[in-house]
Amino acid sequence: MSLGRYTRLDEIGRGSFATVYQGVHTKTGTYVAIKSVNLSKLNKKLKENLSSEIHILKGLYHPHIVALIDCQETSSHIHLVMEYCALGDLSLFIKRRDTLGDHRYTRDMIAKYPNPPGGALNEVVVRHFLKQLSSALKFLRDRNLIHRDIKPQNLLLCPSPSSYRSGAGSGAATVVPFKGCEDSFNPATGVDSLPLLKIADFGFARSLPATSLAETLCGSPLYMAPEILRYEKYDAKADLWSVGTVLYEMVVGKPPFRATNHVELLRKIEKGEDRIKFPEDNPASDAIKALIRALLKRNPVERLNFPEFFENEVITGPIPGLLADDQPSISRHRSVDPGTTEVPPRPDSRSGTSVPSGTRREREVNREDVYSPRSSPRNQKPSTPPTSTPMRRVGSTDRPPSAPKESEPPMAYPQRPNAVSHATAPGRQELLDRKATTTAIERQRSRNTYSEGSPRLDQPADKLKEEQERAAQDVAFERDYVVVEKRAVEVNAFADELAHSPRIQGGLSRAAQAGAISRRATVQGATPTLSSPQTTTGKAMQVFSGRSRADSTHHRQASYERRYGQSPTSATSAISKALNMASGRLFGMGFSPPLTITKGGRSPPLAYNPFPAYPTAHGSLMIIGDGAKSQVALDEDTKTVQVIEECATRSDVVYGFAEVKYKQLIPLAPSIQTDPSAKSNMSGVRDTAGSTDGDLTVDATVTLSEEALVLYVKALSLLAKSMDIAGVWWTRKNRGETFGDPVMSRADTTGALVGTRINNVVQWVRNRFNEVLEKAEFVRLKLIEGQKRLPPDHPSHPSNHSVTSSLGAGSTDIVVSSGVTAEKLMYDRALEMSRAAAINELTGEDLAGCEIAYVTAIRMLEAVLEDDEVPGLGPGKVDTSKDMYDGVPAEDRQVVVKLVSSIRGRLQALRKKLAILAKRAPTASVNV
């Protein structure tokens, strides 16, 4: 397949959204890597992030950074043409260290510098790679860039530069890569006869001044700095921790800290107390070990800083043990290219909408997927080897004159959108126990603790304070949603910990009848029915989509690999503001199971089903509190399960009510509009790509958006509480306070059932939360769009929003009309449903539907009364000394409590009537 000046060859890797091919420059025969990204799989936000990522890398030319050579966009794909690294990545290099002597490109290296039996790589090779890595990092730091995902999988290797000058020798390179710039394959440091290292995957890279602090959780867990794992603000020193872990792995052969899950990983780092141990037979020098220990300091203030790192003797000094043939000459031949002297010119033409050839980009959106072991270049055989190709690499003759070189002053790079947080980043136990109302305060305390020591200490106090304030302003936009993101990470970490706990898994095997609720692998793949990814552009919906999650088995591969998934970021600052606006609390987690709450509904319009669709697979989940009396005394564990399930069920009822509003905002697909039978089943696909609202007026759109938003936020709060209660239970369980006497077989069986049921709820809550966040973001955008379309004199028009009425400090603050609250909407709806059910009951119409309506009304009113205490008081049990409880006046709460009691009475009477009718039915059939 031809792509402009390149011919696409065999596939060498595949990711979630992209396929990587080996390619060759048509005229010169030099090799490239071509990543083809399928645009149909990208939502708008992922496209924007990809563009920003390309934009931030424009003008970055360095021999130890993988170059983006060209970028061509067609109607269906984006093709990224990158430098080809024939030796794969450093992780494969270390993994296959015992077979490097058989590879044509590394045979000579192993002959001169054999790998020691007690370590991973020869120290000469280790120091060589470290020098080249530090050269690239210094280049980035001079431009205020932080990579944020340094790991062996993102360090790509090319054959030694000398192999291109070996003629027809045994070590000569047969796959000559296309050059991104003049010095692409001329090392800035290190040994010319050893493989060339290049940093790839700038998916997490962003501009970060030296005194600024970031908060976004990103990176690969095994190599992630502890301050990121602790959800604290961090600076560029986070990269140095990652360098320390990579250096340790090159020396020892494995990462310094390993665990089965992220929570345990952080615990091991903390438990180690900066005592980095090496195997007794490890031959690494004291200088290397000292550097590793200086880099792997838990406290970033104590950690080696960049100037000290760049000036370390291991970086600046000669390499001990280097053979005479490899000793550096007086002047490095950086300008000498291998092969012939003639340089074929690079064409100036571009096909499609392409980025200038100077554009830089890392290898791909999903590095570890694309460069998997199966796609290692060592196993690749090019379809068309460039046997007669000039050995001189091309690509530098047509470099734009304005292309910045390394010697030029640092450029001003745009600040890219914040990167994705890993779906299973760890959450500390104390964070799981923390109440939502104190989360922001306590996190702010931890940030302040760190930020005091982060800037350079040699600056005057006043200047230091000034820079701290400026740094805080620089990341203020990020902080708005990072709190939500951290909450999301905590919840998902807890859900993963629970799902993969040996005790829970043991419970699953002993109590299989409980039936785990399976959850789908991806968000978009399971629910394309309500919103297309092109329209739902919010970060909130993208927290954890696109990667496989664990169901009831322990698959942890994705835990230690960064995956963009279907969407690269987590909850947005706007969602955070919406949450603040509507409930005063911050929530975040992610998921959405393919539930059928919209099927078989009776009223109101758009197939709203008043009965909760909360999953009750195999009777493992209980719904209580609807008037039925408890027949047995419940132990503490069973009560906990009931409280969690009740809270989740209430959230499901609120979610169903919000769906009514949401679906009216989405135009029906043409097939549903023309098919009457399809209109009765709203689980069909909806087209959200259009910008029209059907027959809705602007006022109606704004009203529906406001109501849907506050209802979704209420559902989020209930889901968050369910997870908090489960977190408290799990903490007690880990302290041995939950299951009782382990010797008792009955207690053990009960504990297994409890663990299984709670795990089912936790996984369901995680999935539902992601769906709610996704839809809340869509509604938020609809609300903003609708408010802008209102007449200028309308109270809800943005020009009429006062500073005091808006929440947040950004340009995307959300303002809802006065009186629009979830509690009022829920109360009115419950009252309407109960009245309609009472009328039908009196007339004897649809008694089964009356029962459903009564139960749903009770659940909705219980949600109004729900408090934030964990484990908290039940509905109706309120501290009467408070004038206001969760935004509801005490007098109003009493009215709601009385209404709940009244509906419970009607429900009991109705069920007695239904029982009598059920007994009569068999008798009547016999008589017939």
Curated annotation (Swiss-Prot):
Its EC number is 2.7.11.1. Residues 437-452 have a biased composition (Polar residues). The keyword tRNA processing does not apply. Keywords: ATP-binding, Autophagy, Cytoplasm, Kinase, Membrane, Nucleotide-binding, Protein transport, Serine/threonine-protein kinase, Transferase, Transport. It is found in: Cytoplasm; Preautophagosomal structure membrane. Signal peptide: none annotated. Residues 6-315 form the Protein kinase domain. Residues 359-371, 459-470, 548-564 have a biased composition (Basic and acidic residues). It is a peripheral membrane protein. One of its GO terms (cellular component) is phagophore. Its main location: cytoplasm. GO terms for molecular function: ATP binding; protein serine kinase activity; protein serine/threonine kinase activity. Pfam families: ATG1-like_MIT1, ATG1-like_MIT2, Pkinase. One of its GO terms (biological process) is protein localization to phagophore assembly site. ATP binds at residues 12-20, 35. InterPro entries: Atg1-like, ATG1-like_MIT2, Atg1-like_tMIT, Kinase-like_dom_sf, Prot_kinase_dom, Protein_kinase_ATP_BS, Ser/Thr_kinase_AS. Residues 318-470, 544-571 are annotated as: Disordered. SUPFAM superfamilies: Protein kinase-like (PK-like). The active site is at 149 (proton acceptor). It catalyses: L-seryl-[protein] + ATP = O-phospho-L-seryl-[protein] + ADP + H(+); L-threonyl-[protein] + ATP = O-phospho-L-threonyl-[protein] + ADP + H(+). Homodimer. Forms a ternary complex with ATG13 and ATG17. Serine/threonine protein kinase involved in the cytoplasm to vacuole transport (Cvt) and found to be essential in autophagy, where it is required for the formation of autophagosomes. Involved in the clearance of protein aggregates which cannot be efficiently cleared by the proteasome. Required for selective autophagic degradation of the nucleus (nucleophagy) as well as for mitophagy which contributes to regulate mitochondrial quantity and quality by eliminating the mitochondria to a basal level to fulfill cellular energy requirements and preventing excess ROS production. Belongs to the protein kinase superfamily. Ser/Thr protein kinase family. APG1/unc-51/ULK1 subfamily. This is Serine/threonine-protein kinase atg1. The gene is atg1.
